[in-house]
């Protein structure tokens, strides 16, 4: 998922912040925020965000377990909880999970 919020003029300074929002068994969801700043201003403006999923693998390409993530800030907690809903939606759409099993996803509509 990639969301573009604002255009970035040529010559802007970009700051890219990437944080793991949730770790599952062998996969991690990484939330990326992109901020722009002009050369003449100190003010930063969020222009883009993206969500990626990575799978940890060993030297033979087999998935391996990743450490648990414990969110600290309110934003981290919000993204942590939303990550499970995104994962369940992805699994349902891929046919790897029955919609009836996607309890966190169903909770949005209850």
Residue ranges, per PLM feature:
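Small beta-barrel nucleic-acid-binding modules, principally OB-folds
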Residues: 1-9
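HotDog/MaoC-like acyl-thioester-processing domains
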Residues: 9-10, 21-110
């Amino acid at each position: 998922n990639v969301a573009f919020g604002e255009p970035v003029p040529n010559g802007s300074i970009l700051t890219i912040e990437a944080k793991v929002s949730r770790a599952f068994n062998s996969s991690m969801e990484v939330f990326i925020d992109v901020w722009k700043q002009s050369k003449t201003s100190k003010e930063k403006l969020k222009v883009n965000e993206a969500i990626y999923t990575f799978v940890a693998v060993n030297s033979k390409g087999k998935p391996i377990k990743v450490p648990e993530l414990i969110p600290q800030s309110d934003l981290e907690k919000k993204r942590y909880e939303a990550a499970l809903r995104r994962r369940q939606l992805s699994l349902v759409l891929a046919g790897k999970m029955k919609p009836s099993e996607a309890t966190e996803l169903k909770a949005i509509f209850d």
